[in-house]
Curated annotation (Swiss-Prot):
Mg(2+) 2 binds at D273, D275. SUPFAM superfamilies: DNA primase core (SSF56731). Its cofactor is Mg(2+). May act as a DNA primase. It comes from Arabidopsis thaliana. It is an enzyme of class 2 (transferase). Keywords: Magnesium, Metal-binding, Nucleotidyltransferase, Transferase. Residues 205-304 form the Toprim domain. This is Primase homolog protein. One of its GO terms (molecular function) is 5'-3' DNA helicase activity. Pfam families: Toprim_4. The keyword Lipid biosynthesis does not apply.
Length: 337
């Protein structure tokens, strides 16, 4: 006579739950082993993930940004719960990004190989400037003629109208940077990094580099058309490291992308902001461009204890003649910093 066996039991007398406990424990050990290996591999990439639980997005200090004393945690790290891999990205301009598998294979590290988007005025829905934006620039001593020549436009983002600084290269729109009236910035994603006003320096051997688009426009009001602006602002401090190779110099990719224009210049006047970051930017530019052909602008005094910050501030307060004088009085860049 055959014996009835309960559904929850196997014929050897062990329940299915009992049978699978050792297998589950073994699986946990495998995952733990993978996580330990992954932590070590991440450490080799300069990422300390010891306090980052799997399955949760953790914020860390980016190993590439050099945030100094600010301690900004700009790197987001995600470790997959099964320990198979981890991915990370930095929201600051260094652009560090990567995926690491537990076997140690680095799928990607820097944001290279991205396909550049092709954009047009129509595709990104730019519009002619309204009176409010024109009045904004008029208050900063920037004329409508200068705005028109530089093809400054506007865009509607949600319920807000923002300024659109269009970036052109040989007549082609390659990027666009937006500025709200409350001074918030955003750029079109996955577009080519170039200097603002690039086509204005194609046929000249002497160029001026400023820190922001309004400063480039201000230079034009003072009679200087051979001026470009950096697209990304300034670093907090000068890097203590050697200049990276072209493929790794992501923060200054616009310099490499514009090298065909810049290499023809015999005299480069650096007119960045007079504050700490502005002077750090001046040094980083001079390091890459060659200090022997660079000149540095010192902004005139605003008061006994304070200097003007930038070109647009000089234009607004003192007019085009003093701005022109400041540029003409630029001094040779110190070969030793």
């Amino acid at each position: 006579m055959s014996e009835n066996v309960p559904d929850h039991q196997s014929t050897n007398g062990f329940s299915s739950s009992d049978f699978f406990v050792p297998e589950e424990e073994a699986g946990k050990k495998v995952v733990l082993s993978k996580l330990v290996t992954l932590m070590r591999k991440l450490s080799e990439q300069g990422i300390d993930a010891q306090n980052c639980p799997p399955g949760v997005r953790s914020c860390l200090i980016c190993p590439k940004c050099e945030v100094g004393d600010s301690g900004e945690k700009s790197l987001t790290l995600y470790i997959y719960p099964d320990g198979s891999s981890a991915k990370w990205t930095c929201r600051r301009k260094c652009g560090l990004k990567g995926v690491l598998q537990v076997d140690g294979k680095l799928v990607s590290k820097d944001p290279i190989g991205k396909v550049e988007r092709k954009i047009t005025v129509e595709s990104i829905k730019l519009e002619p400037l309204c009176d409010e934006i024109q009045d904004f620039f008029a208050a900063r001593a920037i004329s409508g003629k200068t705005l028109e020549r530089n093809r400054v436009m506007q865009k509607r983002i949600d319920d807000e109208i923002v300024i659109a600084f269009t970036y052109w290269q040989r007549g082609e729109l390659v990027s666009c940077k937006y500025r709200s009236l409350t001074k918030k910035f955003v750029q079109e994603r996955n577009t080519r990094k170039i200097l603002y006003g690039l086509d204005d320096i194609e046929e000249t051997s002497e160029i001026i580099i400023v820190e922001g688009e309004p400063d480039k426009l201000a230079m034009e009001e003072a009679g200087f058309f051979n001026c470009v602006s950096v697209p990304d602002g300034a670093p907090e401090t000068v890097s203590s490291k050697e200049i990276p190779s072209e493929s790794k110099d992501t923060a200054f990719k616009y310099i490499w992308n514009c090298n065909d224009y810049l290499k023809k210049a015999s005299r480069i006047v650096i007119a960045t902001d007079g504050d700490g970051p502005g002077q750090a930017l001046a040094e980083e530019l001079a390091r890459r461009l060659g200090k022997e052909r660079c000149w540095l602008v010192k902004w005139p005094k605003k008061s006994e204890d304070e200097h003007f910050k930038d070109a647009n501030e000089v234009l607004m307060s003192k007019g085009p003649h003093l701005l022109k004088e400041a540029i003409l009085n630029a001094e040779p860049y110190p070969l030793k910093s």
